[in-house]
Amino acid sequence: MPILRSATSTQGRNMAGARALWRATGMKENDFGKPIIAVVNSFTQFVPGHVHLRDMGKLVAEQIEAAGGVAKEFNTIAVDDGIAMGHGGMLYSLPSRDLIADSVEYMVNAHCADAMVCISNCDKITPGMLMAAMRLNIPAVFVSGGPMEAGKTKLSNQLIKLDLVDAMMKSADKTVCDDDVDAIEKSACPTCGSCSGMFTANSMNCLTEALGLSLPGNGSMLATHADRKELFLTAGRQIVELCKRYYEQDDASVLPRSIATKAAFENAMSLDIAMGGSTNTVLHLLAAAQEAEVDFTMADIDRLSRKVPCLSKVAPNTNKYHMEDVHRAGGIMAILGELERADLLHSDTRTVLGMTIGEQIAKYDITLTKDEAVHKFFRAGPAGIRTTKAFSQDCRWDTVDDDRQNGCIRSKEFAYSQDGGLAMLTGNIALDGCIVKTAGVDESILKFTGDAIVFESQEEAVEGILGGKVRAGHVVIIRYEGPKGGPGMQEMLYPTTYLKSIGLGKECALLTDGRFSGGTSGLSIGHCSPEAASGGTIGLVRDGDKIAIDIPNRSIQLLVSDEELAVRRAEQDAKGWKPANRQREVSMALKMFGHFATSADKGAVRDKTKL
């Protein structure tokens, strides 16, 4: 029978000093012997997705203590990728994921916590906490802050829905007047919560549902809606139940590694492909799988991407639907239900509610249940009122969206495409693969051959795009922006946004060893592995080289002979695999990240051979 980890510091005469300190935190005599549960919060005033989380830890803690546990809250850092975008701050975004994972491990292990509730929301925070949960393998429940409402404004007397990407794109479009840019800026992000489309933050919070580590509705219920409060209350109660089952009943099936098995990772990836999620999720799932010691690789992603259809298109892949519309259509349980009916889901994986994922679908899929409470839950909608307060409104749609032919979520029969929303491409320029969000690619450019134009940094690429160097037919190469080469593997949202703003969104391709924001769409191919700094072929491309991209056949080729590439490689070996003439100040923290980082196909995690 497992014993409470916290007994190390709460039991026995020799722990009198530790107990004295525990008492100073508010613990009483009868608290010693109860499970100590870490409430891992990520409140910060820097990030709209986290600005409302200050009081969430208290909500969870009250439920933990009422159910018989002891709650102890601490905070992690949180980086806002949108605010860090387009300058040196973006170099810190991906490394913050690993720092978050480490900080959670440090706090939980230093204080011998027995379990944890992870309160996350935005891009690197959910993955960092997920990596920590897999690493620690103690009972854990995830509950996120929720998505913000979509922005709305009138342009040319027409009401349109907006998000962060619209503000970025229109600001670079010289045909849009200053007044319209101002109106968009002031309307794009109206409430607290993670940005309103299927960007990285919302994608990851949806995937925790598929992994079985969060509650139904976690990925889609709006941050502002009163119904979201119940997710936090339930998380607090449920973590105590998981503690009882593990520590009192010796039931290891409640542990994260027992829930997030390889089958669960496949479910999460299938969901990601079906909903056209952010390409960053590939990076983070690979990293979490390594922490869980699950053999889940790019080969599995490639296999799944060839058979899972695209069942939902949400911003940035369309301006018609945002996360509030996904929720109205039944949320993640509805998409998983369609995958189950298409025989594309492992229905027997477990969840933190003690059910199988199949049992959860039967209970929460709006097309299967007539339960009025479930339908009411998924009718929760936006209020259209600017606010930074959670649970501040109780607006509801009149009906749910259960139209699986033309609605936000489709059945396999009426899928947006039988080919999924994400694809892995391989070829001589990406021997270990690269990733493209096919849900955001226009059908006219699924096959594309063009001339390379090479940039050694994101900044140089932005200057080239806005300066008129990039023309229709170009394949824009941005290299030395991978985990090592950046270092930090910054996102390339500005280059893709600017290509669209100058009318080249369907006329060019972009290939990088860096990564893309969840807000990216178009023929934008990232995670090219091996990266240039590791001797990848992308480091050998020269201006004017032909590159052939064939998404249907999952191929990407540099049309240069092997003999010529061998000559170039020898020359580059002599020079060293570094960007030419790039001026970039790199801190010691970033140098350390780059030194240990693997390429994107390994999740950009630490290379253990260097430890």
Swiss-Prot record:
Gene Ontology cellular-component annotations: cytosol
Domain of life from the UniProt record: Bacteria
Residues reported to bind [2Fe-2S] cluster: 122, 195
Biological processes, Gene Ontology terms: isoleucine biosynthetic process; L-valine biosynthetic process
UniProt keyword annotation of Translocase present: no
Active-site annotation: 517 (proton acceptor)
Sample GO molecular function, one term: 2 iron, 2 sulfur cluster binding
Residues modified to N6-carboxylysine: 124
Family annotation (SUPFAM superfamilies): IlvD/EDD N-terminal domain-like (SSF143975), LeuD/IlvD-like (SSF52016)
EC number(s) from the headed UniProt entry: 4.2.1.9
Binding site for Mg(2+): 81, 123-124, 491
Cofactor note: Binds 1 [2Fe-2S] cluster per subunit. This cluster acts as a Lewis acid cofactor.
Catalysed reaction, written as an equation: (2R)-2,3-dihydroxy-3-methylbutanoate = 3-methyl-2-oxobutanoate + H2O; (2R,3R)-2,3-dihydroxy-3-methylpentanoate = (S)-3-methyl-2-oxopentanoate + H2O
Record InterPro entries: Dihydro-acid_dehy_C, DihydroxyA_deHydtase, DiOHA_6PGluconate_deHydtase_CS, ILV_EDD_C, ILV_EDD_N, IlvD/EDD_N
Pathway where this protein functions: Amino-acid biosynthesis; L-isoleucine biosynthesis; L-isoleucine from 2-oxobutanoate: step 3/4; Amino-acid biosynthesis; L-valine biosynthesis; L-valine from pyruvate: step 3/4
Cofactor section: [2Fe-2S] cluster; Mg(2+)
Alphabetically ordered keywords of this record: 2Fe-2S, Amino-acid biosynthesis, Branched-chain amino acid biosynthesis, Iron, Iron-sulfur, Lyase, Magnesium, Metal-binding
Function statement: Functions in the biosynthesis of branched-chain amino acids. Catalyzes the dehydration of (2R,3R)-2,3-dihydroxy-3-methylpentanoate (2,3-dihydroxy-3-methylvalerate) into 2-oxo-3-methylpentanoate (2-oxo-3-methylvalerate) and of (2R)-2,3-dihydroxy-3-methylbutanoate (2,3-dihydroxyisovalerate) into 2-oxo-3-methylbutanoate (2-oxoisovalerate), the penultimate precursor to L-isoleucine and L-valine, respectively.
Family annotation (NCBIfam families): ilvD (TIGR00110), PRK12448.1 (NF009103)
Family: Belongs to the IlvD/Edd family.
Subunit record text: Homodimer.
Protein name (Swiss-Prot/TrEMBL): Dihydroxy-acid dehydratase
